[in-house]
């Protein structure tokens, strides 16, 4: 596989940006939204999408307000990977009045058990969870049915050769899903899936920090030691470059997650580049990858939608990420939580991603803000309940020392 230098990556990005901007039209609020074909699906998606993950911690009122703001700008694609029945209900209530205007990317294999998210390939549970998704989203079909979260080639091979993929095909044949997709963090899995011809859409984590790293082959080996970073590391990882090219060449629509790296790229102190990026710069980086169709950004309030949609009218200077990439270190994200939630389920019922989020918010301040402490104390289970079993660490795609962070959070918050 070909290896690119930073200079080549930046030059390619500049050319690609000019090409797609010249070809995109738009409507929506103030006529600013841009749209792209979603691979060969026949669907056109807004380049700014709605990753609804953060609605889980928000009220129905906020969820509806964010959804209406998205609609006002012409955002037309939403991702719902979450299995929590409460967030599914909130999202369903918000999108139901304008269901036909939304392209729903829903996940099969994301289930709810004993009050927690759990990923599974057990078909009876998957079928029950999918029926729940349809009911709570108040719809009789999902536009893009995603095979939820596969990060090893071995698991992909098992799924593609077994009853799970057959179930996905049955859903498509019945019209309950219109297209089959896959979500993964591992470019090797993405490459295998795209080459198989079995998927039409790929949801993949794309940002400048992740793109310089080698692929994940299995969670426990992610970033295991400095030997993962050789002297040649510095441009985009060749596996990722190949994946993006394959998506473009074969018409597999690339829907982007983690464009902001969980918000860490906005903070100079926490960013691996030691320089803060803006939402516009992160979005521009993602959308200049070959095959990229939409960035599924996360929002906590309507103003976050405004910040993302500003991309559509941003100047070249506002979109410029090259000056940051030119100063990028060789490696970036070893041991840093992006609040993705893949560590679940916790044997003690702790919402690990939320505890980590609140902990990071708290330690960034001279003292714990009252609002952060209030949110923490309102959680059903606290970091002090951690038993250090470390089962969560085996599921973490970023090799975070979760047990140690739980101890630190318990000490900081007092429970």
Where are these regions (language model features)?
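Local cysteine-cluster metal-coordination motifs and their immediate loop/turn environment
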Residues: 335-349, 383-398
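Acidic (Asp/Glu)-rich catalytic clusters
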Residues: 40-42, 92-100, 135-138, 194-197
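N-terminal secretory signal peptides and thylakoid transit peptides that target proteins
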Residues: 1-16
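Active-site groove signature of glycoside hydrolases
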Residues: 135-155
């Amino acid at each position: 596989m070909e290896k690119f230098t930073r200079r080549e990556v930046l030059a390619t990005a500049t050319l690609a940006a000019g090409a797609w901007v010249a070809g995109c039209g738009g409507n929506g609020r103030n006529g600013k939204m841009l749209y792209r074909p979603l691979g060969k699906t026949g669907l056109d998606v807004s380049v700014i999408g709605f990753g609804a993950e953060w609605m889980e911690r928000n009220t129905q009122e906020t969820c509806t307000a964010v959804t209406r703001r998205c609609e006002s700008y012409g955002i037309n694609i939403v991702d719902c990977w979450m299995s929590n029945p409460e967030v599914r209900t909130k999202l369903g209530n918000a999108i139901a009045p304008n269901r036909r205007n939304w392209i729903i990317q829903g996940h099969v294999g994301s289930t709810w058990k004993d009050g927690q998210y759990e990923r599974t390939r057990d078909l009876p549970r998957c079928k029950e969870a999918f029926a729940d998704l349809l009911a709570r989203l108040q719809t009789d079909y999902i536009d893009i049915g995603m095979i939820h979260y596969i990060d090893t080639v071995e698991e992909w091979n098992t799924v593609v050769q077994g009853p799970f993929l057959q179930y996905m095909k049955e859903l498509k044949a019945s019209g309950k899903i219109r297209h089959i997709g896959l979500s993964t963090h591992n470019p090797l899995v993405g490459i295998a899936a795209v080459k198989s011809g079995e998927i039409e859409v790929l949801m993949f984590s794309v940002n400048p920090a992740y793109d310089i790293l080698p692929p994940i082959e299995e969670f426990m080996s992610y970033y295991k030691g400095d030997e993962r970073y050789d002297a040649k590391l510095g441009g985009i990882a060749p596996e990722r470059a190949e994946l993006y090219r394959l998506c473009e060449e074969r018409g597999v629509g690339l829907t982007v997650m983690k464009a902001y790296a969980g918000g860490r790229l906005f903070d100079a102190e926490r960013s691996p580049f030691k320089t803060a990026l803006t939402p516009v710069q992160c979005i521009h980086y993602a959308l200049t990858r070959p095959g990229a169709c939409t960035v599924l950004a996360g929002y906590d309030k309507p103003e976050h939608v405004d910040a993302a949609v500003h991309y559509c009218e941003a100047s070249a200077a506002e979109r410029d990420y090259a000056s940051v990439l030119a100063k990028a270190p060789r490696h970036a994200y070893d041991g840093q939580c992006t609040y993705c939630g893949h560590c679940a389920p916790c044997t003690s019922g702790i919402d690990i991603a939320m505890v980590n989020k609140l902990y990071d918010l708290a330690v960034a301040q001279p003292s714990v803000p009252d609002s952060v402490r209030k949110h923490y104390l309102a959680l059903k289970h606290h970091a002090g309940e951690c038993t250090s079993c470390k089962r969560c660490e085996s599921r973490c795609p970023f090799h975070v020392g979760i047990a140690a962070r739980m101890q630190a959070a318990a000490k900081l918050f007092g429970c």
